[in-house]
């Protein structure tokens, strides 16, 4: 019997048993993501199956397989979206970063949100690709000498190291434009025009001066500041805009494309905001606890640059506590949705909390 969630009475019916509290629901979540495990390998973020894994396929969601399938689908769609054509140099620069792998968390989130509200992968794919194009654009620009001056990204030389600063700037610009072109062209006929207009507005807002750009500017202006003079409010502003805004857009776009109601869209917005902050808190922790080899990028760079980070402001232990609190808050936003369809998003929050790179 499928799990039944009631947001009004807050009980959960699962195989004839009733759970009447959020803590009971959290226990159910642990079984739902049993196959996830917090043990991650140091290469590519692959999950190591935990000992004693349940053989009951109905009680455990295989997030690893789900993530691999979605990442492969997204990568195939991205490959088609940027064919090699003249001028070859810019196309090669675009493809170099866009097809460099990665966990594809943002497009996965977009697709899972679409499926949660009744849509399917095909309907969400153009938006999922658009979000990944913008994410890649932001990474190319973020790595430039005038920004973070990074040498490695996903275990490879950064775009400007491979193609030069001029071509890297243009590759990032091209991806930004291509994202909107791709989403609107490919989705034509699949999504109602009014929903497409809203999706475009949401995505544009997420990456402009009310979103990603605002976070990057505040981050740059905060380098070298004394942590004692800067509160958590400023750090949260940076991460809500620089990191969470695009994750939020991914979830909202998926819900819009899938025909979600206003209530469903807002629940997914709050969920994504929580995992967006969670993603960055964990990123800050990994920057001081993992090696360059494990991360696929230069470890300790934020500390060396004097950046504001959660460990720098509140220490490692409190940072871990904040991460767990955000994971729980994200899961709470999924109460009321069909549990089978929500399983990928429950697992995604746990994956982000437990990742090693």
Swiss-Prot record:
Residues where Mg(2+) 1 binds: 142, 148
Ligand binding (isopentenyl diphosphate): 103, 106, 135, 154
Report a single Gene Ontology molecular function: geranylfarnesyl diphosphate synthase activity
The UniProt annotation puts the transit peptide over: 1-37
Q: What is its EC number?
A: 2.5.1.-, 2.5.1.1, 2.5.1.29, 2.5.1.10
Q: How does it assemble?
A: Monomer.
* Entry binding sites for Mg(2+) 2: 142, 148
Q: Does the keyword Metal-binding apply?
A: yes
Q: Which GO terms describe its cellular component?
A: chloroplast; plastoglobule
Q: Which InterPro entries match?
A: Isoprenoid_synthase_dom_sf, Polyprenyl_synt, Polyprenyl_synt_CS, Prenyl_diphosphate_synthase
User: Can you name this protein?
Assistant: Geranylgeranyl pyrophosphate synthase 11, chloroplastic
Protein family membership: Belongs to the FPP/GGPP synthase family.
Q: Does the keyword Membrane apply?
A: no
Catalytic activity reads:
isopentenyl diphosphate + dimethylallyl diphosphate = (2E)-geranyl diphosphate + diphosphate; isopentenyl diphosphate + (2E)-geranyl diphosphate = (2E,6E)-farnesyl diphosphate + diphosphate; isopentenyl diphosphate + (2E,6E)-farnesyl diphosphate = (2E,6E,10E)-geranylgeranyl diphosphate + diphosphate
Q: What does the protein in this record do?
A: Catalyzes the trans-addition of the three molecules of IPP onto DMAPP to form geranylgeranyl pyrophosphate.
* NCBIfam families documented for this protein: FPPsyn
GO process annotations (BP): carotenoid biosynthetic process; farnesyl diphosphate biosynthetic process; geranyl diphosphate biosynthetic process; geranylgeranyl diphosphate biosynthetic process
